[in-house]
Amino acid sequence: MCTGGCARCLGGTLIPLAVFAVLANILLFFPGGKVVDDNSHLSDEVWYFGGILGSGVLMIFPALVFLGLQNNDCCGCCGNESCGKRFAMFTSTLFAVVGFLGAAYSFIVSAVSINKGPKCFMTNNTWGYPFHDGDYLNDQALWSKCEEPRDVVPWNLTLFSILLVIGGIQMVLCAIQVINGLLGTLCGDCQCCGCCGGDRPV
């Protein structure tokens, strides 16, 4: 597959992943599917906006760049037929790095939150974090330590797990584009388009 075509495929995959990440992060503001009375009762990691910023906003820009690569004109520099395409592929590599860092941020925030557990109203009538070092992951009986919001443990665990998986997939896809972009920069795309007037190799 041409490097431009590969990038377009990656971009088309990143867009829905970014949308799902944003939606998952938004749902975290409604623990157990309910509106909280006090925002301070939400887990700290929810406010880090891992899904909205990391896997969402910072992923949209690279995805759009990747999608536009296949149609990019390859006649851009002083009459050199491959220069424009190579520069576009190099630029996509930089955007892929940005996307990778955003996905990594979301991945780390999600992993920390899963290990830490949700903030909830505990049996001692205070709000806090009753779990330690992910102990609740292997012992569902510990979930009873959280009295309110109802079902906050499975809610947070499910949504942060989704963000963890999405972040991991996005990191892999962006890493692939870094390699793909470098190959496109060094070797050129498999064909020349636009003002170059034909399907000549570069």
Curated annotation (Swiss-Prot):
Main localization, broad class: membrane
Membrane topology: Multi-pass membrane protein
Glycosylation sites: 156
TM stretches of this protein: 10-30, 49-69, 94-114, 159-179
Keywords on record: Glycoprotein, Membrane, Transmembrane, Transmembrane helix
InterPro entries in the cross-refs: L6_membrane
A Gene Ontology term for the protein's cellular component: membrane
Localization: Membrane
Cited Pfam families: L6_membrane (PF05805)
UniProt name for this protein: Transmembrane 4 L6 family member 4
